[in-house]
Each structure stands twice: as structure tokens, then as C-alpha cells.
């Protein structure tokens, strides 16, 4: 890894834990076992689920590309696919739309909205922008400086 790439990783804050340059599909698959890295080989059905989520987030065509060579937006989308791959009951998202272009912001908002509409699903989402919040939320906590 060159100095420029290491610098870019430190600046992005998203990928430092993925210093092994694994294919994007393996990064998504690591979400099946909540691990950083892929230590247990997923079976064909699990890999199909990973590819499905990558398709939902619009990055299936990048499944074999080295994760660290993806753009920051593509990395974000792959990591979001990783978060959803296990169909969690509780999903915690920290600024999931950060760094995405308008098209992908819209795409991710729709996916988040669909997740929030499902029964027995809970999501905690951190954002600086109220317009990024799903319309289906039932509770909101706003933090304001000095209050």
C-alpha cells in the first residue's frame, strides 16, 4: 500500500479496519458473522444473499473488485450491504448517506425506509440532517449545542 492510499484511508474513517484488500463480496460476507475479515467460508446460499444485497445497493458489478480500490461512495455502499446482509433486528447506522451522490442517497434512503417499515425491526440512525431521516421513524432525539 502506498503512502497516498494509506493517507486516503486514514482520512475517510470508513475503511481502516479493512486493510486486507479483499474482494468487495468478502467484505459484505464478513457481515454474516460480524467479523472484520472473512474467517469462515460462507456457503453458496449465503454468497447469493451477499450478492443480492450488493445488487440492492447497486454495487453487485464490483463484487470481485478489491475493496480498497473502490471509490469512497462505493465502499460506503458495500459496507451498507454488509450491515443489512444478516437482516438484523437492530440496525445502527452512523451517517449512512455521507459521501454518496444524489442518486445513491435516494437509493439508500428508500432501502432504509423499507427496512423501517418491516415489523420487529429497530433502527438507530445518526445524522446531522433532518431531511435524511426515514419518514417512518416513531422516535427522535435531537441534540443541540449548549442544550
List the predicted regions and their residue ranges.
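Conserved ABC ATPase signature
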Residues: 66-70
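Conserved ABC ATPase "signature" region
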Residues: 29, 44-62
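Hydrophobic anchor residue at the start of the ABC signature
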Residues: 80-81
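Conserved catalytic motifs of ABC-family nucleotide-binding domains
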Residues: 87
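Catalytic Walker B motif of ABC-type/P-loop ATPase nucleotide-binding domains
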Residues: 91-95
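Helix N-cap at the start of a conserved alpha-helix in ABC-type nucleotide-binding domains
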Residues: 102-104
Amino acid at each position: 500500500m502506498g503512502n497516498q492510499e494509506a493517507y486516503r484511508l486514514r482520512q475517510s474513517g470508513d475503511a481502516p479496519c479493512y486493510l486486507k484488500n479483499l474482494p468487495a463480496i468478502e467484505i459484505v460476507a464478513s457481515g454474516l458473522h460480524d467479523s472484520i475479515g472473512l474467517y469462515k467460508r460462507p456457503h453458496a446460499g449465503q454468497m447469493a444473499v451477499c450478492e443480492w444485497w450488493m445488487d440492492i445497493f447497486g454495487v453487485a458489478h464490483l463484487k470481485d473488485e478489491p475493496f480498497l480500490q473502490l471509490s469512497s461512495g462505493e465502499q460506503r455502499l458495500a459496507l451498507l450491504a454488509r450491515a443489512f446482509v444478516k437482516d438484523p433486528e437492530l440496525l445502527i447506522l452512523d451517517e449512512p448517506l455521507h459521501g454518496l451522490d444524489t442518486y445513491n442517497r435516494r437509493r439508500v434512503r428508500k432501502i432504509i425506509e423499507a427496512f423501517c417499515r418491516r415489523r420487529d425491526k429497530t433502527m438507530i440512525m445518526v445524522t446531522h440532517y433532518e431531511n435524511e431521516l426515514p419518514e417512518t421513524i416513531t422516535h427522535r432525539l435531537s441534540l443541540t449545542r449548549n442544550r
